[in-house]
Amino acid sequence: MKIALGIEYNGTHYFGWQRQANVTSVQEKLESAVSFVANEFCQIYCAGRTDSGVHATGQVVHFDTKAIRSEKAWTFGLNANLPADIAVRWAKVVSEDFHARFSATARRYRYLIYNHPLRSALFPTGVTHHHVALDHHLMHQAGQYLLGEHDFSSFRAAQCQSNTPWRNIHHLHVFRQANYIIVDIQANAFVHHMVRNIVGSLLEIGSGKQPVEWMDWLLTQKDRTLAAPTAKPDGLYLVEVKYPNHFNLPKNPLGPLFLGEPKIDFHHD
């Protein structure tokens, strides 16, 4: 039997998704809980291997098991055996041809920036604090240069193991809610550190250090050393993974926290 799970987690205290020796990972905690509930070892496969300190509200995973449990039993049983910063939002029996990573058609991330001169005591984690005033309109305009299929070498980490730097960005929206700026980006897939590297350069543009057209220039140069430093992991969330409709997977409300779909006409920003 193959089971898919919708997972959310606060990645602050984890060295990323992937199991590694001598450090704590989300995969390790989840595999331990699933294996306990299933009464057999179950290996977990995820849609997106998030880095150290990165969070998720819409991670999707799957595992194979001989255990017969109801979807409700999987959800409540796993949550009873997971730490407080990892939670299962849904469980579903899926067909044998489903794979959390290879069946996915798109991944969507949100980067949450607390844009205020003073830091917040209520959100010491889960957001990236940027004290310099940012113009989210300029950031949004710059992001439109990245839409479509491109070579994203300028936003690719040096240690990236992908065979190709080509990716297809479906949308990139930047919007503000009070003191929070949200960068919402969806693509077929991402190279290593791609979202955080893009956000790093958007911050330069939003703070007035670089013009909007700089983003277009960076893309054409295909040189990571020319772009801005990588943005911190604190504000990054994997919020949605998309699959073909025939898998009929449940959908979590888009997060994090209070964030839903923005009611903004981006064409007139």
Swiss-Prot record:
SS bonds (residue pairs): none
Membrane-spanning residues: none
GO function terms (MF aspect): RNA binding; tRNA pseudouridine(38-40) synthase activity
Record keywords, A-Z: Isomerase, tRNA processing
Residues forming coiled coils: none
Positions bound to substrate: Y109
Keyword tRNA processing found: yes
GO biological process: tRNA pseudouridine synthesis
UniProt-listed Enzyme Commission number(s): 5.4.99.12
Top-level taxon of the source organism: Bacteria
Catalytic activity: uridine(38/39/40) in tRNA = pseudouridine(38/39/40) in tRNA
Function: Formation of pseudouridine at positions 38, 39 and 40 in the anticodon stem and loop of transfer RNAs.
HAMAP family: TruA (MF_00171)
Entry's family note: Belongs to the tRNA pseudouridine synthase TruA family.
Summary of subunit composition and partner proteins: Homodimer.
Name by which UniProt lists this protein: tRNA pseudouridine synthase A
